[in-house]
Structure formats: structure tokens, C-alpha cells
Amino acid sequence: MVGWKKVGSFLSQYKSWCEAETGDRNKRLWKAKIPLKIKIFMWLIKVNAILTRNNLARKGWKCDKTCSFSANPESIEHLFFGCVMTKYCWSLVSIVIGADCRPASLNQYWVWANRFMPAHKKIHMIGLAAICWAIWRMRNSIFFEDIKKCRSPTKIICLASSFILYWSDPQSSDDKSNWR
């Protein structure tokens, strides 16, 4: 799984991109059946306000600016899509859903999700939120608790899966059948 491939006609790619750029994402975020703190977390990612190391440095905090998983500068785009560890996580998800590529950015995620899971639009935001939250939690464990570096992307994916199951628990029984 290497990067992003051009698939379909230019027109279909453009339509997918335009659809992804509309306010549809904001509606999906606030209507998603995920905890409010996760909705706020995802919104902070969207507006580049999560306190990654580069954002902390911009605020004057003196810290190592490198990613907890790799030796590259830690930005939102890098942490959630560009890091070697997170690329591997997205590759695992791609294999599970039968995709031949993985998203390389937040914007590409929406086109990718619409292409490979067109019948499951209600879970696009939930899946993205679970993976991003799992990456963030693992990053924070390394950053704040000084645990050994995570060498297993499967731990991140298992953590994301547990979030999805946990978040689905308080849902009504009618909605639960669509989650499992």
C-alpha cells in the first residue's frame, strides 16, 4: 500500500472532492454517535488547534518538536496521516475494508471513505474519530507517561476498535445492529 492512487475519471474525482469539501463533514461530526469530547477533539483537528509539538512550540513552549512515533516534526497532518506508524495503521484499515490505497491526509480520508465504503456514510466519522483518538491516546502515553515507544500499529487499531465498541454501547438497540 503506497500512498494515494488516482482512480476513476477526473470528473468523478472532482465531484468526490467537492462533496468532501462541503459543510457535510461538519454535519457528520456533530451528528455522529460519539462522545462530545471526541467531537470537540475532531473539530480541533479540523481547525489545526490540537496541541501537537509544533503547535506547542508556536505557543512558546520549549519542547522537542519530533513525533513520539518517529524522528519527524510532529504536526497534525504528520501525526494522523504522515507518520510511519500511522501510515501502517491506515494500511491495516485499508486491508480490512478491501481498499487498494490508504488516505494520506484528512481531506483524502473523505474521498477514500466515500470510494471504499459508499454504503456506510454514517460510520465514516466514527471510524475516523476512533482511529485519531487512539493515535492521540497512544501519543500522549508516550509523551506524558514516558512509556516505551509503541512499536505495534495493531495496538492502535485494537484501541480504536475498543473505542467504537464502547461508544456504541449506550446506543438504542435499533442502532446497535448497524454497528457490529
For each feature predicted by the language model, list its residue ranges.
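Charged boundary/loop elements
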Residues: 1-180
